[in-house]
């Protein structure tokens, strides 16, 4: 692998992880804030809100893990090499 391809792969891997973490990070913050607000308004619905929040947080975190997988493929099993 030449040095230009290696450098581009490292930069692409960094962008994959960084950009894949921005969206879910913002979404998780908004979801947690809305859940806290909902629990404050209706404490009796805390169980349902918490369950829905945890499920949605898991789906959002999956997007970040996909970005990590793409970065690892670019670094260790580079299809462009």
Swiss-Prot record:
Q: Which PANTHER family match?
A: ATP SYNTHASE LIPID-BINDING PROTEIN, MITOCHONDRIAL (PTHR10031), ATPASE PROTEIN 9 (PTHR10031:SF0)
Q: Mind listing the UniProt keywords for this protein, alphabetically?
A: ATP synthesis, CF(0), Hydrogen ion transport, Ion transport, Lipid-binding, Membrane, Thylakoid, Transmembrane, Transmembrane helix, Transport
Q: Which SUPFAM superfamilies match?
A: F1F0 ATP synthase subunit C
Tell me the compartments it is located in: Cellular thylakoid membrane
Site note Reversibly protonated during proton transport applies to 61
The membrane-spanning stretches of this chain are 6-26, 57-77
- Can you state the subunit structure given in the record? F-type ATPases have 2 components, F(1) - the catalytic core - and F(0) - the membrane proton channel. F(1) has five subunits: alpha(3), beta(3), gamma(1), delta(1), epsilon(1). F(0) has four main subunits: a(1), b(1), b'(1) and c(10-14). The alpha and beta chains form an alternating ring which encloses part of the gamma chain. F(1) is attached to F(0) by a central stalk formed by the gamma and epsilon chains, while a peripheral stalk is formed by the delta, b and b' chains.
Q: What protein name does the entry list?
A: ATP synthase subunit c
Q: Which residues form the signal peptide?
A: none
* One Gene Ontology CC term in the entry: proton-transporting ATP synthase complex
Q: Tell me the function of this protein.
A: F(1)F(0) ATP synthase produces ATP from ADP in the presence of a proton or sodium gradient. F-type ATPases consist of two structural domains, F(1) containing the extramembraneous catalytic core and F(0) containing the membrane proton channel, linked together by a central stalk and a peripheral stalk. During catalysis, ATP synthesis in the catalytic domain of F(1) is coupled via a rotary mechanism of the central stalk subunits to proton translocation.
Is Plastid among the key words of this record?
Answer: no
Say yes or no: keyword Transport present.
yes
- By its UniProt entry, which HAMAP family does this protein fall under? ATP_synth_c_bact
Query: What membrane topology was assigned to this protein in its record?
Result: Multi-pass membrane protein
Domain of life, source organism:
Bacteria
GO MF assignments: lipid binding; proton-transporting ATP synthase activity, rotational mechanism
UniProt similarity note: Belongs to the ATPase C chain family.
